[in-house]
Design a protein with these regions (language model features):
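Periplasmic/cell-envelope proteins involved in peptidoglycan metabolism and beta-lactam response
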Residues: 1-273, 365-377, 386, 485-488, ...
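Conserved "repeat-terminator" motif of extracellular CCP/Sushi domains
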Residues: 625-637
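Conserved SxxK-family serine transpeptidase/carboxypeptidase catalytic domain
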Residues: 124-138, 144-161, 165, 216-217, ...
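Soluble non-cytosolic domains of exported or imported proteins
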Residues: 57, 86-91, 122-129, 170-174, ...
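BRCT (BRCA1 C-terminal) domain core and associated BRCT-interaction motifs
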Residues: 605-625
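Beta-lactam-recognizing serine transpeptidase/beta-lactamase-like catalytic domain environment
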Residues: 71, 196-207, 248-294, 299-533
Length: 637
């Protein structure tokens, strides 16, 4: 009996211990849930009650090098409807449909949904500020307005093929907007509304605000003032010559900073749906590949001087209009030939046989090596979307004929940005720089997230060779085929290009891409400008007559924008019969009108206003004016 009692007592202890352990476990669990998991479980509970009204944070701006906004944002709210808070959807539809200019029945279908929160899109997405104010005045229960933005392009079509655009959900779809979408996109804010199962507001739980963060600003290397000049000139060329397309690229040859970049035709980023994808998907200065023509001769010239195989001023070359290479007759653009010339005159006249001779003296292997050193056959590293690599001959396929045609820019395929990168190296002292367009990325808090600096790839030619190349190309503008780029007071150097277009492996008769690449000041270049016009319709289709004047005008106007120095020791222009004689417009502002009236000028003056001093003038100082042209001077006190 005693044994049975002890056995029962032992079992009772075990049961009591088990109950105590179970109770302790419950206490521990309660502590864990009530204290340790309090915030987590509260958030889970709130998730069943809350509905978020998103407030989009602003997408980052895109600015030029001077901080001028070229892409920004415009407030465009979006409407949300909570059906549980307003059952009178018929009346809501009657009020909203005319205001939103949408079909009442389609809107009613959205308003009638049993979802806790319905986004009224597309009808109520990105409404105008005026519409938002009208909605606010209606005081409709259950209707909420969420902050939203759309992209705003204050300069319209300017830079559109570089910048790209955003889509319906503010995501970048092309250009810079696409390439740097993650940088530009911010993290949105939101209001959390707490409701019961029926959608009624829970008054004991206050609404919450979740703060987001705006996107970063991207500062480009371009100057919007120069960009406006470039795009104006391209637009005029397109209209004047009924061209298929045109492009331009301006760069600081000492750093690789892209100062302007343009492609025509252009488009409005806010209505991109109206144009073909080939317009907004192709940034021509990096995408387009073609035979460069005579602008490529700068590479041959640089290699020939570096290898010391020519003497520009003291050595003569005879051009009979063609030269024979392994049975192939390679002609000069001037059928009758240029006759006896120095090699400097070969450069001035853009004489094909003369450049073939330079290439022959350099040698095929070395010429091909220089072409690669100058960056051809590979992407420049600009990080611009859609950049092509171009096409070069392989070493095995680079025979005497291929070497000869390459020497004057035929038979190879390059991009405009490759040409600009290479010519920059030829004139800046011999250093090949990586072109770049993004200067800085700046966070919404003002912190600089990234800052790009000039990146030198390699030394291609010596400073002495580069100086001789600059001098030769300045002579091209003063005395040779580039004379239409000449500007009094500005030392301009450059080279023309006229390349026959290729289709299905054959050259097309009468169809050309004409180009000109120019720089200033010629003794210390600060800007390099390349312009190409595709299939211009004109009697004289040459880079010398079509694109050289365009580049000259861009460089002339860039002088005041970039502060280029004027010089009195430039090479004098060699005038020939038929050339228009021009001179630079003086700076009359601040002078006394009576003193100016006493002088004699080759142009006519038209006076405006009253006063003692000249307060304004047209054209601006430095602009080229013709003899007998009318200028306008404005008097004031």
């Amino acid at each position: 009996m005693k044994w049975i009692f002890k056995q029962a007592q032992g079992r009772l202890k075990i049961i009591i211990i088990c109950f105590m352990l179970y109770g302790l476990a419950i206490l521990i669990r309660l502590f864990y849930v009530q204290i340790a998991q309090h915030e987590e479980l509260t958030e889970l509970a709130k998730a069943n009650w809350d509905r978020e009204i998103p407030f989009q944070e602003e997408r980052g701006d895109i600015t030029d090098r001077n901080g001028e906004a070229i892409v920004t944002n415009k407030l465009a709210p979006t409407l949300y409807f909570m059906r549980a808070q307003n059952d009178n959807v018929e009346e809501v539809a009657d009020q909203l449909a005319p205001l939103l200019k949408t079909d009442r029945e389609k809107l009613l279908e959205k308003l009638s949904r049993r979802a806790y929160l319905t986004k009224l899109a597309p009808e109520g997405k990105n409404i105008t500020a005026e519409q938002a104010e009208q909605v606010q005045q209606l005081q409709i229960d259950g209707l909420y307005s969420g902050v939203d933005y759309v992209r705003h392009y204050p300069y319209g079509t300017l830079l559109s093929r570089l910048l790209g655009f955003t889509g319906y959900d503010s995501q970048g779809l092309a250009g810079i907007e696409y390439e740097y979408n993650d940088v530009l996109t911010g993290q949105g804010s939101a209001i959390r509304l707490f409701t019961d199962a029926k959608g009624n507001a829970m008054r004991q739980t206050p609404d919450e605000w979740r703060q987001g963060e705006g996107g970063a600003t991207i500062e480009l290397t371009v100057d919007v003032r120069l960009q406006q000049v470039v795009e104006r000139e391209l637009a005029q060329a397109m209209e004047k010559y009924s061209a298929e397309q045109a492009l331009a690229l301006a760069m600081n040859p000492k750093t690789g900073e892209i100062l302007a970049i343009s492609s025509y035709p252009t488009y409005d980023p806010t209505t991109y749906q109206k144009v073909e994808p080939s317009i907004y998907n192709r940034n021509l200065p990096v995408f387009m590949t073609y035979e460069p023509g005579s602008t490529f001769k700068i590479i041959t010239l640089s290699a020939a001087i570096e290898e010391d195989v020519i003497d520009l001023e003291n050595e003569s070359f005879y051009d009979q209009g063609f030269t024979m290479v392994e049975g192939s007759r390679l002609r000069c653009w001037k059928r009758q030939g240029h006759g006896h010339q120095t090699f400097l005159e070969v450069v001035e006249n853009s004489c094909n046989p003369g450049f073939i001779e330079m290439g022959h003296r350099i040698g095929s292997d070395k010429l091909l090596s220089y072409i690669h050193k100058f960056g051809f056959g590979e992407k420049t590293g600009s990080n611009l979307a859609g950049e092509a690599s171009g096409i070069l001959f392989s070493k095995e396929g680079f025979g005497p004929v291929e070497s000869a045609t390459t020497a004057f820019g035929q038979g190879v395929s390059v991009t405009p940005i490759q040409q600009v990168q290479a010519v920059a190296a030829a004139i800046n002292g011999g250093t090949l720089y990586t072109p770049y367009i993004v200067s800085r990325m700046i966070g919404s808090n003002g912190q600089v997230l990234l800052e790009n600096k000039p990146s030198a790839k390699r030394q291609v030619i010596s400073e002495e060779t580069s100086k001789k190349v600059r001098e030769a190309l300045e002579s091209v503008v003063a005395n040779g085929s580039g004379k239409h780029a000449y500007r009094d007071g500005l030392r301009v150097g450059g080279k023309t290009g006229t390349a026959q277009k290729v289709e299905n492996g054959r050259y097309k008769d009468g169809d050309y891409i004409v180009s000109f690449i120019g720089f200033a000041p010629a003794n210390d270049p600060e800007i390099l400008v390349y312009v190409a016009v595709d299939s211009p319709q004109a009697q004289s289709v040459f880079g010398s007559t079509i694109t050289a004047p365009i580049v000259g005008q861009i460089i002339e106007e860039s002088a005041s924008i970039l502060g280029l120095p004027y010089s009195s020791d430039q090479l004098p222009k060699k005038y020939v019969w038929g050339d228009e004689v021009t001179e630079a417009m003086p700076d009359f502002i601040g002078q006394k009108g009576s003193e100016v009236m006493e002088q004699q000028y080759t142009y006519r003056i038209e006076w405006h206003g009253k006063g003692d001093k000249i307060i304004d003038q047209l054209p601006v100082a430095g602009k080229q004016i013709k003899q007998d042209e009318i200028i306008h001077l404005y008097l004031g006190n």
